[in-house]
Amino acid sequence: MAVDNSTSDAHTPGRQLTVVDIAIIAVYFALNVAVGIWSSCRASRNTVRGYFLAGRDMTWWPIGASLFASSEGSGLFIGLAGSGAAGGLAVAGFEWNATYVLLALAWVFVPIYLSSEIVTMPEYMQKRYGGQRIRMYLSVLSLLLSVFTKISIDLYAGALFVHICLGWNFYLSTVIMLAITALYTIAGGLTAVIYTDALQTLVMVAGAVILTIKAFEQIGGYEQLAEAYAQAVPSRTISNTTCHVPRADAMHMFRDPYTADLPWTGMTFGLTIMAAWYWCTDQVIVQRSLSARDLNHAKGGSILASYLKMLPMGLMVMPGMISRVLFPDDVGCVVPAECLRACGAEIGCSNIAYPKLVMELMPTGLRGLMVAVMMAALMSSLTSIFNSSSTLFTMDIWRRLRPRAGERELLLVGRLVIVVLVGVSVAWIPVLQGSNGGQLFIYMQSVTSSLAPPVTAVFVLGIFWRRANEQGAFWGLMAGLAVGATRLVLEFLHPAPPCGHPDTRPPILHGVHYLHFAVALFLLSGAVVVAGSLLTPHPQGVQIQSLTWWTLAQDLPLGVKTGDGRASQRHAFWARVCGVNAILLMCVNIFFYTYFA
C-alpha cells in the first residue's frame, strides 16, 4: 500500500529549452559535422588499413581522448548518475578500476598485438590458436555484445535524454541522432571517429564541470552531500518497506561482500576481469591504441584516458546523488504509479537523474550546451562502436565468406553492416527498458559478467601460457558460454522484483552477485582451457612465435628509423616519461580509493 507523506503538490512542470538553447545545439552539431568532414577529407579512406586503423599514424592525445569518449557514451552519463542516485558513490569504482587495465593495455597487450601484426582481436585468436572456429565465435560474440550492451544502451539513454529535454517522440529522437552519427562514421572511417571524439571529450568535460558546480551550489557544497542524501526520501512510499530509504553505506567505496549492492570483493576481482575484457580485448577500445604511430603514443593515450577516467566520480556520480536530493519524488520514486508519471517506467526512475538536473538547474544557453554534451556522448560512443563492429564483420566474417573480395567490396560491406546493427539495436530497446530495477548501468554490467569472462580467460592464457592450444581454448569458451548464457536467460525470465514484493528468483540470481559470478565463470573457463590443453598436443611453433609475452618480436614499431641515434634517444626519453606518469597515476588512484574507502 502506498503512503503519501507530502504536504503539497511536489510535481511542478519541468522547464523547457528556449530558442537560444536550440540555437546552441544547432551550432554544436554544425561544428561536429564540420570536424567529421574535415577529418574525412584528410584521411586515407580508400584502403582497408586507412579506413579501419587511421593509417596507424595517430598521436597520443586524440587516442587518449577517443578512449575516454568511446567509454563515456550517453549510456554511461545517464547510467552512472542513475546508479549514483540509487546507491551512492561505489559505482564510481567501475571508472577508477580502468586505470590498471588501461596501463595493462598499453604495456602488455598492445606490444603483443603489434608483434602479431593483426587488425582485429579475433584475428589474433586465430593466429595464436589456429583454426577458424574461435575467430568466428569471437566475432559473432563481439557483434552481439555491441548490440545488447553498447548500441542499444546508448540509443536508449540518448533518446531518453532528448525526450525529457525536448519532448520529442522517443523513437523520433533515436532516428535523428542515428542519422547524424552515421553520416561521418560511414564517410570517414576511424580517422573521422577519433578526431570527432577529441571534440566530444572537450565538450563533455566542460559541460559536466559547469553542471557539477551548479549542483553543489544547490546543496551547499560537498560537506552537505552525505547528510542531504540520507534524507532524500520520496513523499509517497510503500508501507512496511525500506526500499525508499537511501543506503547507509552510500558514501563508501568498499562495501560488505555478502549483503551490499556492490561488494568490495566483486568490485576488486570480478570487475577487473570484466574490465580486462573491455579495455584489453574489445575491438572498440583496442582499435584506437592500434592506430598509434608508435608504442609511446599508445602508452600516452592510455595514460591520458586513465587521468580522464578519474573525473566521473565528481562529474556524473555525485551529480546523480544531488539530483535525488533535489527531486526525490521523481528520481527516488518507489510507487509504480509515481514512477510511471515521472519517467514512464514502473520499475524506477533513477535513470532520469542527470537529464532532470540539466533541465532544472542550468540557465538558458547552458541548458542547450548540456543537451549538446549528452548528444556528444551518444555520438562519441556510437561512432566508435559502429566503426569497430563494421571492422569485425568485414575482416573476420565477410572475408571468410568471400576470400576474393576486393577493397571496394570490403569497404561497402563495412558501411552496410552499420545499418543492420542499428536496426537490431533499436528493436532491443524495449527489452532493456525494464531490466535490473531500472538501472541502465547495472543492466550493462550484468550482461557483460555473463559473457565476457571466458573471453578474458582465453586471451590471458593465450598471452602468458605457451602451452595453451586451440582445443583447450575453444572448449573453455564453450563451457563459459553455456554457463553464462544460462544465467543470462534466467535473468531475463526472472527479473528483480519491485519494491514490496518477495524475491522468488532462483538461488543463482539472488544468492550470487553478478560480479562474484564473473570470477567463478573466469575460473571455470580457465580451468577448462588448462585441462583441454594438457590433454591434447602442444601448439605449433608458428602459433607461439611473436604471439605471446615470452616470444615478442624484437622489431616493434617504435617510430625510430634504423641508425637514427638522436631519434632513439628521444624515444627512450618519452618512454621514461610514460613510465613515470604511469606510476604517478597509480598513486593518485590509490589515494582516491583510500580516501573514499
From Swiss-Prot:
Protein's membrane topology: Multi-pass membrane protein
Protein's cellular compartments: Apical cell membrane
Expression sites by tissue: Predominantyl expressed in kidney. Also detected at very low levels in testes, skeletal muscle, and spleen.
All ranges on the Cytoplasmic side of the membrane: 38-73, 122-139, 196-201, 287-301, 389-410, 466-472, 536-576
Primary subcellular site in the record, as a coarse category: membrane
Membrane spanning stretches: 17-37, 74-94, 101-121, 140-162, 175-195, 202-222, 266-286, 302-322, 368-388, 411-431, 445-465, 473-493, 515-535, 577-597
Residues of this chain annotated as glycosylated in UniProt: N5, N97
Extracellular compartment residues: 1-16, 95-100, 163-174, 223-265, 323-367, 432-444, 494-514
GO annotations of cellular component type: apical plasma membrane; plasma membrane
InterPro entries registered for this protein in UniProt: Na/Glc_symporter_sf (IPR038377), Na/solute_symporter (IPR001734), Na/solute_symporter_CS (IPR018212)
A GO term for molecular function: D-glucose:sodium symporter activity
Pfam family of the protein (one): SSF
Catalytic activity: D-mannose(out) + Na(+)(out) = D-mannose(in) + Na(+)(in); D-fructopyranose(out) + Na(+)(out) = D-fructopyranose(in) + Na(+)(in)
Entries under Gene3D superfamilies matching the protein: Sodium/glucose cotransporter
Alphabetized UniProt keyword annotations: Cell membrane, Glycoprotein, Ion transport, Membrane, Sodium, Sodium transport, Sugar transport, Transmembrane, Transmembrane helix, Transport
Function comment: Electrogenic Na+-coupled sugar symporter that actively transports D-mannose or D-fructose at the plasma membrane, with a Na+ to sugar coupling ratio of 1:1. Transporter activity is driven by a transmembrane Na+ electrochemical gradient set by the Na+/K+ pump. Exclusively recognizes sugar substrates having a pyranose ring with an axial hydroxyl group on carbon 2. Has likely evolved to enable renal reabsorption of D-mannose, an important constituent of oligosaccharide chains of glycoproteins.
Family, per entry: Belongs to the sodium:solute symporter (SSF) (TC 2.A.21) family.
UniProt-recorded name of the protein: Sodium/mannose cotransporter SLC5A10
Source organism (scientific name): Bos taurus
Gene (name only): SLC5A10
